């Protein structure tokens, strides 16, 4: 089960004090703490592929 609700709500709490918005970590030291992508986007190793963009973190907004 994916603990991240980002794909449904746009935000999630990834455990402890770590919170994410739009699959980007906002309150911990990691660049990303959710292995999820926005609705309609594909997941890949380094981020999300949205709107035909290449696979990198800038795709997941």
UniProtKB/Swiss-Prot annotation:
| Region of interest (Beta), residue spans | 1-28
Q: Can you tell me which residues bind a divalent metal cation 6?
A: 37, 41, 44, 60
Give the family from UniProt: Belongs to the metallothionein superfamily. Type 1 family.
Q: Which gene encodes it?
A: mta
**Binding-site residues, a divalent metal cation 7:** 50, 55, 59-60
Summarize where a divalent metal cation 4 binds, as residue positions. Answer: 33-34, 44, 48
What is the name of this protein? Metallothionein A
What organism does the UniProt record list as the source?
Salmo salar (Atlantic salmon)
Residue sites binding a divalent metal cation 2 per the record: 6, 12, 14, 25
């Amino acid at each position: 089960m994916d603990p991240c609700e980002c794909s449904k709500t746009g935000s999630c709490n990834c455990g402890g004090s770590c919170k994410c918005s739009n699959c980007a970590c906002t309150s911990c030291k990691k660049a990303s703490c959710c292995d999820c992508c926005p609705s309609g986007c594909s997941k890949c190793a380094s981020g999300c592929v949205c709107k035909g963009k290449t696979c990198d973190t800038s795709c997941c907004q």
